[in-house]
UniProtKB/Swiss-Prot annotation:
Organism: Pectobacterium atrosepticum (strain SCRI 1043 / ATCC BAA-672)
EC category: transferase
GO CC terms of this entry: cytosol
A GO MF label: methionyl-tRNA formyltransferase activity
Protein name per its UniProtKB record: Methionyl-tRNA formyltransferase
Similarity comment: family membership: Belongs to the Fmt family.
Gene3D superfamilies recorded: Formyl transferase, C-terminal domain, Formyl transferase, N-terminal domain
InterPro entries: Fmt, Formyl_trans_C, Formyl_trans_C_sf, Formyl_transf_N, Formyl_transf_N_sf, Formyl_transferase-like_C_sf, GART_AS, Met-tRNA-FMT_C
CDD domains per record: FMT_core_Met-tRNA-FMT_N, Met_tRNA_FMT_C
Length: 315
């Protein structure tokens, strides 16, 4: 391997922890870790450390949890670590220009899309919902813009018809660390080549909201099915019946015309609950009523058949 680099790692969720884990077993030295402050989580709202913090503490690496990197005293924490490079993966805080300039080789970011497509907070989900045929990981040199920096490495990954955000997340979490190590090798031996992004092709992946997860029957069955896969595992698509939300975990498209109003239940049996969409039919196969476990359409029909009488409308 090339010369060992002194690395600051900045990240928060499991996706980031998987990258840190690979760095810890590489020949590089992780001199410090920045992660979001502990947050309330679980039923008891107990303060819970991020997956990145847990991993760093297991390896006795100094952990820093500032609420912002704008104050000079917090920027001084970064400077004092005297790093060659800062690796940022789903950190959740903005890095101001002084921080970007502190490491000798700057700051690099692992982003879950093929930039300039899907800059922003939810690239995996937005690529799925849009019906893209592929996604991937881009490693870029960070600048002050939102995912606008020059690209150092790209790895593509096909999006399969059955992929959900959960399965794509796992695929990219496996691809990203490999690309990160290759990029660090090139930075260490000065062979890295940075390619500017073409802003004309940029798209933006806005953060997901629970409101968006409500199924809109005025969309086509294909769009609804993609929405269900994109919002799995969070926030999970849903509809309202009998004034209660019912989450939808799995569905399929039936490419068949119908003369019914969108949202109308056409059929309900062990094969699924067929609902009219603006174009085509959505056959719902796995559901979850409020406070219950995920179940098959047949199991829900056994207890709540009155919810799904053909001719009734879902909201």
């Amino acid at each position: 391997m090339s010369d060992s680099l002194r690395i600051i790692f900045a990240g928060t969720p499991d996706f980031a922890a998987r990258h840190l884990d690979v760095l810890l077993s590489s020949g590089h030295e992780v001199v410090g870790v920045f992660t979001q402050p502990d947050r309330p989580a679980g039923r008891g709202n107990k303060l819970t450390p991020s997956p990145v913090k847990v991993l760093a503490e297991q390896h006795s690496i100094p952990v820093f949890q500032p609420k912002s990197l704008r104050p000079a005293e917090n920027q001084a924490m970064v400077e004092a670590l005297d790093a060659d490079v800062m690796v940022v993966v789903a950190y959740g805080l903005i890095l101001p220009q002084p921080v970007l300039s502190m490491p000798r080789l700057g700051c690099i970011n692992v982003h879950g899309s093929l930039l300039p497509l899907w800059r922003g907070a939810a690239p995996i989900q937005r690529a799925l919902w849009a019906g893209d045929s592929e996604t991937g990981v881009t490693i870029m040199q960070m600048d002050v813009g939102l995912d606008t920096g020059a690209m150092l490495h790209k790895i593509a990954c096909p999006i399969l018809p059955q992929d959900t955000s959960a399965t794509l997340y796992d695929k990219l979490a496996a691809l990203g660390p490999r690309g990160l190590l290759e990029t660090l090798e090139r930075l260490a031996d000065s062979s890295a080549v940075a390619e500017a992004q073409n802003d004309a092709f940029a798209t933006y992946a806005e953060k997901l909201s629970k409101e968006e997860a409500r199924l809109n029957w005025l969309l086509s069955a294909e769009q609804l099915e993609r929405c269900i896969r994109a919002f799995n595992p969070w926030p999970v698509s849903y509809f309202i019946v009998d004034e209660q939300p019912v989450k939808v975990w799995k569905a399929e498209v039936i490419a068949k015309s119908h003369g019914s109003q969108p949202g109308t239940i056409l059929q309900a049996d062990k094969q699924g609950i067929q609902v009219a969409a603006a174009d085509g039919i959505l056959n719902i196969q796995e559901l979850q009523p409020a406070g219950k476990k995920v179940m098959s359409a047949q199991d829900l029909l056994n207890s709540r058949r009155e919810w799904f009488v053909p001719g009734n409308t879902l909201n």
